[in-house]
Amino acid sequence: MRYTRKDYETFLSTELETQMREYARLVETKAIVLKERGDVFVGRFIKLQENGMVVFKVRVNDNMPRKNTFWTASYFINEMGSYKNWGELSWAELRKQYQRDCSEALCAWLSKSEDSNFCLVGIKNISVEFAQILEKERPIIAFGPSDPPLEYLMNLIAIVRDTNCAVTKQILDYEPSESNNWNPTKVESKEDLNTLLAQKLQVNNCIAIQGPPGTGKTYRMAALSAELLRQGKSVLVTALTNQALIELVKKKDLKDFLDAQKVTKTSLTVDESKELPKLQPNKKNLCNAAPGYLSLATFYLSSAWAKDAIEIPFDYVIMDEASQALYPMIAASVKLGNKIIWIGDQNQLPPIVLTGDDVINRYDWGGIVKGFNTLCTNFSYPSYMLKDTFRLTERGAACTGIFYNNDLNSVSKVQTIKSSIDCLNKNGWPTFLGMDLEPGDKTPTLAISSIIDLVEEILSEDKDAKIAVLSKFRPTVRQIQKQFILQSKKSEIPENVKIETVDRVQGLTVDYCIFFIPNASLKYSLEKELFNVATSRAKYCTIIVADKSLMGKDMEEEVRKYLLKSQDDKFVAFNSTKNITAGNVSVNVLGKIDLSKFEKKRKEIVEGKENIYIIDTNVFVNCPNIIDRIGHKYKVIIPAKVLEELDKLKLKNNIDKNALNTAARNINLAFTKQFSKMEDADISLLPVGFDKNNPDCQILSVALKYKGENPIILTSDNILQTRAKGLGITTISLTDFLRQLR
């Protein structure tokens, strides 16, 4: 078998521990520091609207929350309502000692206030009890980190531990296929998918469906659910997000069942019930299978039902967003239904996990993370691919089709764009806008301002145009949202403008999409699945904003081909062979040689991570040209403390002044050419017991900022090396570093 039960449990336990550790690190940080970083914000209650939305007033000069982000709203007693009194208390200590009440919260919108020093924030998902306190006392509320979904992982651990369950054995204990079994039947939009599925399900219990962007996955699943309900079947639709469930139940095929109060949903919120008053709450979130009824539940709750199930409760289970399910969740679904339909897209985003890529690669856990892909490539269940996209133009489908073996076909009624805006391709091609972006800067002011100007220009031409502004990074999105409120002529971010991270928009359809790629940690923005999601949202045009030099960066072949198309073939890809002649001489070019293959592999480098060198003071003293020796392939960070120490060394008599001057010139040149940058210490990241005034500890705190990547402290200081290794930070001495370059 590919994975033992111990393998599954070890991965899930590792992810559980990682989430707990990251959450603990966050909440044990001083609350005032979290506020300065944007991980906590405070607002004064203004009003409770009829639709269940709660409005708060927040200072503009604070870090405002991103739209559609989850928080824990905490009401602190007495003087602790003011952040100025938080002192040295951590967020956890504040909640433990001073919290009177709390509620889950979701930031739904941002808006300007009559007072230019403040903005308004709309919050939903507030509990009824908490809302009553707000209306009565009108307090200041602090919003902090939301709790991680630990119960979901614990449910999956219980499922993989159960070796006696016959139905999960066929999924969990599979033998890997020697070849890729994924060869789906292509389904056109005019074909009756329900009839095809009904025929296959007579002799098969499971079916897998791939739904590329805009192919009508949700519409098809709503139609299938309605047909099954008419047959008197009990049906469960489960998905990762509540939003996916709400989008499904809003489809017209389910209206009669909604009106008949035959559709229930777990964890129904006030705003959801306002939007869909006939949707019934599953008040205790218990498994409620019943003939002719549709149950809606997220993975977090359906996994609990699967854990506790002794007999299979539902006739049919439809797993939407299956590509966002961990493989044990795929197994959990077969405990819930006699017939299973998985629908997802293995070329879009997999589940988000906090366990590092290096750990996942080391233990070969990729197949557990990308569960739907594992299912599709190793099992020979009947499979289908929806090949007609209603969203994309012919040219848009040609670009996105690169990710689908060019099998994507456009049936959109829109093929050309009626716009006078110069940068929008009138024929539906994606557009590439190259700018000069500073390396390492995730919130470049000029680029963000230009993006907002473009959004305003589109809205001035069509005020109802649906626009998405997407980026990989949360700080980028937070800054764009904030600047839109401050810079735009609008009083708030309109409902038809969505500014969000890519991982939160799978399934979104808009008219125009602007995908902003900051010149920082590029490999994450250019990751194939994420790039595909970001560039396949728009019906009319996708605009990619990035650094001019982007095409010179390393990226996967499909992404490069897409970008080449987006630049109207200004760049071309060579064929596998090319003939060059000069006079009587002829040469066949068969390919290219990657010279990096002949370089010695550095032992401190980790593949799949961004490798970042943090250089200690003693290294510059002994090797002034160290930045050149590292090379421009890797990011180099100079802690501000190092520059301060180098400056002080000039006052000593027994120091090589020429070496210091050379080091200073090289650092200045590296800063000018953007090969390197300076960073201040963040002593809040240091563990308890570390001397926050110690220079070594301050240098160490710079490395801790990049703990999610592979920070490498280059130092000859044995004590600093020991401290770094104790915190899991890679270190290498100057001697060892230079030796491996020989």
What would you call each of these model-derived segments?
Residues 217:
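Conserved lysine of the Walker
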Residues 220, 224:
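Hydrophobic positions on the alpha1 helix immediately C-terminal to the Walker A/P-loop
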Residues 256-301, 500-501:
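Inter-Walker segment of RecA-like/P-loop motor cores
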